[in-house]
Amino acid sequence: IWHSKKNDCRLSRTQVINKRHMKYILATDSFKGCMSSQEVEDEIAEVLNAKGIETVCLPMSDGGDGMLSAFTAATGGTLEPVYIHDLMMRRTDAHYGVTPDGTAIVEVAQACGLSLIKEEERNPMRATSYGVGELLARAIKRGCRKFVIGLGGTATSDAGIGMIKALVDIFARGKNFDEALKTELGECSFTLACDVDNPLCGENGAAHVYGPQKGATPEMVAQLDRRAQLFAEKSALHFGFDRSAEPGAGAAGGLGYAFMQYLGAEMKSGA
């Protein structure tokens, strides 16, 4: 029995001592900002195995921290190292995954996760999703055309503007973004792995619901929400449709919206 009240990695003293003949399936999610699902299960397995109890680890993810390791482990995929910008535009090491069938696995928290920044540094007015666009570009240049995107655990609330900016910088040199969407990204399909259904804007949107945990003051929340509204309005005028109110648009600081509006992504809820 796992004791997670304080994330203290202790086993309950009941029910496990006399169960050595049993096989335990360990299927946990990550502890936000603390341990990935694989790390949690490794800790549990170490204690159980020491008591002679057999374990099977099945890492789980809601799309946030640990999604990449869980997905690649489950599919037998590989991790590809990349050098990108983090949420404060500092150069950093990151990874994306590639499954045996060539599907790219991208965990946005690799580029703009809460775990990448100290609590006192959190500032969603400055934090950017630029590195997410770089992750996508690296995978596309490698030849990947099918993507599974893990949304969650971010310290950003930029509605995906940073990600779009990176894609423009990388793919739209010498041509407009619409042309780049068709030529460079037109063959790509994106499936979003997400466990929230918030819209982009409003009281239930990205800024109001998740902004405070990312360091936003009440004044920042209002500014972030207004910025997202303006971005959605301009985007709707350009494309002739608006996906900002769809469930999950507010996921990962609004990255869900940018993926759906600009890249035609499909939202999939679940673990």
Region spans (language model):
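N-terminal loops that bind phosphate or other acidic moieties
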Residues: M22-L151, A155-A271
